C-alpha cells in the first residue's frame, strides 16, 4: 500500500515536470515566433528606405571625379545637335549637404564657356548658378525654376544634383527582371519644394545597387520622362558609373543622350574652383 502511494506520487511529480517543461517550450516557441514575425514584418516603406541607403553607402568615399562627355539632342522630328562638355564632381564630407558639381561646355562655339555650378542640399533649395558668356553674367537659378530644362536638354535642373537619401520618401513596390538582371522596383517621392515631379519609379539592380532606369511623373501624375542608364564601368574596385544615359520625354517626343568618357578619380580637385565667381574665367 505504501509502495503504491509512493509510486503514484512519483509519477504525478514526473508528469507535472513534463507538463511544465512542455509549457516552457511552447512559451519559448511562441516568443520566438513573435520575434521572427516582428523581424519579418518590414513595411514596403522601410524596405524602400533601406535600398536607398545601400545605394548611397556604396558610393561613399570617392573623393572627387572628372570626365568629358557628349550631349546629343534629338527633337521630335529626329533632327540632332551635338554639344561637348566636361564635368567635375567634388564629394561633400558634410552629412547635411550633398556633392558639388561643375559643368563647362566646350562645343559648339555659340555656347562655349557656358558653365553650370551646383551645390546639392537635402531639403533646403539646391544652390545652382549658370554662367552665359553672351550675357557675361552669372545667373542664380531660382528654386522655383528647378523643374525647368537645362540648356535646352530633357534634363531638368533638379536632375543634375547628387543622389541624397534624405531628399525623398520611399516605397518598395516589387522585384522583377530588368534585362539580364534582377531589380528592386522602388517608388520615391520628392520631399523638397518646387519639384516638377510627384513621384519617380526607380529600377535598382540587386547585384550592385546601380540605378538602371527611372520613370518621372509630372504634377498631373502623368508619365513625363524615362531615364535609362547603361554601359556601367567600375572604378577603384568600388564605384560604378554609367557611360551612357538617355532621357526620353514622352510628352514632347524629344530625347537627350549623354555619352561619357572614362572617369578619373581622386585627382585632388581644388574646392576653390567650385565658386560662382570663378565661372566667368572658365573656358
Task: Tell where the protein language model's regions lie, with residue ranges.
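Bacterial N-terminal signal peptides that target proteins for export
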Residues: 5, 14-26
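C-terminal segment of classical bacterial N-terminal signal peptides
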Residues: 31-40
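N-terminal mature ectodomain segment of secretory-pathway/periplasmic proteins
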Residues: 44-134
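Short, ordered beta-strand-loop transition motifs
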Residues: 91-97, 173-182, 235-237
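Gly/Pro-enriched, hydrophobic low-complexity segments
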Residues: 106, 117-119, 127-131, 137-141, ...
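Surface-exposed beta-loop interaction hotspot
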Residues: 164-168, 175
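Short, solvent-exposed mixed-charge patches
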Residues: 282-283
Amino acid at each position: 500500500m505504501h509502495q503504491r502511494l509512493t509510486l503514484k506520487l512519483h509519477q504525478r511529480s514526473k508528469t507535472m515536470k513534463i507538463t511544465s517543461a512542455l509549457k516552457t517550450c511552447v512559451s519559448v516557441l511562441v516568443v520566438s515566433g513573435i520575434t521572427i514575425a516582428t523581424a519579418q514584418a518590414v513595411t514596403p516603406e522601410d524596405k524602400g528606405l533601406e535600398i536607398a541607403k545601400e545605394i548611397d553607402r556604396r558610393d561613399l568615399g570617392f573623393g572627387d571625379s572628372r570626365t568629358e562627355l557628349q550631349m546629343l539632342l534629338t527633337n521630335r522630328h529626329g533632327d540632332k545637335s551635338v554639344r561637348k562638355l566636361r564635368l567635375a564632381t567634388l564629394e561633400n564630407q558634410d552629412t547635411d549637404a550633398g556633392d558639388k558639381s561643375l559643368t563647362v561646355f566646350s562645343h559648339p562655339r555659340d555656347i562655349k564657356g557656358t558653365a553650370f555650378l551646383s551645390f546639392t542640399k537635402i531639403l533646403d533649395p539646391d544652390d545652382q548658378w549658370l554662367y552665359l558668356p553672351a550675357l557675361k553674367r552669372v545667373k542664380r537659378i531660382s528654386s522655383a525654376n528647378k523643374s525647368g530644362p537645362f540648356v535646352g536638354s530633357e534634363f531638368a535642373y533638379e536632375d543634375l544634383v547628387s543622389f541624397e537619401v534624405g531628399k525623398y520618401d520611399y516605397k518598395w513596390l516589387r522585384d522583377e527582371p530588368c534585362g539580364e538582371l534582377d531589380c528592386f522596383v522602388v517608388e520615391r517621392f520628392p520631399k523638397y519644394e518646387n519639384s516638377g515631379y510627384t513621384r519617380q519609379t526607380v529600377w535598382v539592380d540587386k547585384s550592385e545597387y546601380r540605378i538602371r532606369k527611372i520613370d518621372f511623373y509630372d504634377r498631373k501624375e502623368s508619365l513625363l520622362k524615362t531615364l535609362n542608364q547603361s554601359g556601367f564601368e567600375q572604378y577603384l574596385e568600388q564605384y560604378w558609373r554609367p557611360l551612357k544615359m538617355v532621357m526620353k520625354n514622352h510628352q514632347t517626343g524629344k530625347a537627350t543622350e549623354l555619352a561619357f568618357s572614362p572617369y578619373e578619380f581622386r585627382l585632388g580637385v581644388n574646392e576653390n574652383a567650385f565658386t560662382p565667381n570663378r565661372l566667368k574665367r572658365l573656358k
